[in-house]
Amino acid sequence: MVIKPRVRGFICVTTHPVGCEANVKQQIDYVTQQGAIDAGPKNVLVLGASTGYGLAARITAAFGCGANTLGVFFERGSVDGKLGTAGWYNTAAFHKFAEEKGLYAKSINGDAFSDAVKAETIETIKRDLGKIDLVVYSLAAPRRTHPKTGEVLSSTLKPLGKSVTLRGVDTDKEIVKETTLQPATQEEIDGTVAVMGGEDWQMWIDALHEAGVLAEGAKTTAFTYLGEKLTHDIYWNGSIGEAKKDLDQKVIGMRQQLAGLGGDARVSVLKAVVTQASSAIPIMPLYLSLLFKVMKEQGSHEGCIEQVYGLYKDSLYNSEPVIDQEGRLRADYKELQPAVQDRVKQLWDQVTSENLYEMTDFVGYKQEFLRLFGFEIEGVDYEADVDPDVKISNLIQL
C-alpha cells in the first residue's frame, strides 16, 4: 500500500513503517557520530521505550554505551492489513539495527502498570541479563488500571483552583485562538497524580529491588518538564504539575533505597519537544512553534535524541552532573535561557492567525509532528508500495 499522512487533531491516524525505520536510523547515526559515553550502563531497562524520549534513551544506551536493552511499551502491530502504531515500527527498526551491531535487544508489549508485566520483566532480566544497572521511566499514558485495586484512573490536563484562558493554535484549521479550561476537581487531580506521578515508578523499583535484579551502582531516572511562565498555568501549576511534583517527592525514597547499592535515583528535566504527549497539551503547539523559531535562530535547537544523549554524557554518567537545588538533573537549560524565553514571550503577544507562518516556525512544528509517525523523513520514497506487516524480533507479547 502507498501510505499518506492523515491527521485528526493531535494524532496522525496513519504511520509509515519505512519512515519510522529511517527516523530511528537518523537517531542512531547522531549518537554514533557523537562518540561513546564513558562509564555508561551495560544492561538497561526502558519503560516506555517505543517513542519520544524513551526511544531516545534506549538508542543512547545501546549505540552510545554499547548496552543490552530491554524495552517495555504498549503498542499495536499490523492486523488484517491495517497499519500498526509508530512505536511498533520504531521498535522493529531498533531491534533490527541493534542485532546488526550484535547488541541484545528484547521487548515486552503490554501494560507497564500491571503486575504481570513487572513479573515478566523480572523473569526476562534474570534469564537473559542477570542484573540491570539503569532503569529509565518514560511512560506517558491517559489511563492506568491500578494493579492493586483494579480501579481505572484517568489523567487530565487542567488548571488548579480557577479557570484559565490560554492562547493556542488549532492545528487542523491553522488559526490562533483562545481556549478556556475549567479547573480540575480533586478527583481529577488525584487521578492525574495516580497515572502520571511517581507511584508506578516506585512500584517498579520496589519490585526490581526485591527480586534482586538491580546491580551494584544501579541508577534510575524519570523524565519531567518544568518550562517557564508561559506554560506554567496549564503545566507546572496544573493537574499534570501535581503529578510531576509527586515524582520529586517519590524519588527521595528511591534515592535512599538505591544508596544501599551505591546507586542513585533522579528526576531528569528535559526541554519541550514535539511528542504525541506534548501535542495534546492546548498551549504546546504554539509555544513549540515559537520556541523552534527562536532556538533555531540562536543555534541551540535540539530534539529528543540530542537532549537525551546530552543527559547521559553530561549528567547521568558524569562526575559533575548538571543538577539543580532540588536534586534534579537538568538538560533544559538552553530552553530556559532569558534570551530565549524573553524573545518567545515577545513574539507570543504578536502572533495572529494571519502572521502565524511568518512569526513562528509552524512549518517546523508540523514537520516534527509528522516525523513522529514516519512522514517528512528525508530519503524516503512516499510513493512506493509498503508492506504494513512488520514483525518485531525477540518480542514478548503479553
Swiss-Prot record:
The positions flagged as active site in the entry are: 235
Q: Which GO terms describe its molecular function?
A: enoyl-[acyl-carrier-protein] reductase (NADH) activity; NAD binding; trans-2-enoyl-CoA reductase (NADH) activity
> What is the similarity comment for this entry?
Belongs to the TER reductase family.
Q: Which gene encodes it?
A: fabV
Origin species: Pseudomonas fluorescens (strain ATCC BAA-477 / NRRL B-23932 / Pf-5)
A Gene Ontology biological process term: fatty acid biosynthetic process
Q: How does it assemble?
A: Monomer.
Q: Which residues bind substrate?
A: 225
Biological role = Involved in the final reduction of the elongation cycle of fatty acid synthesis (FAS II). Catalyzes the reduction of a carbon-carbon double bond in an enoyl moiety that is covalently linked to an acyl carrier protein (ACP).
Binding positions (NAD(+)) = 48-53, 74-75, 111-112, 139-140, 244, 273-275
Its name, as the record gives it, is: Enoyl-[acyl-carrier-protein] reductase [NADH]
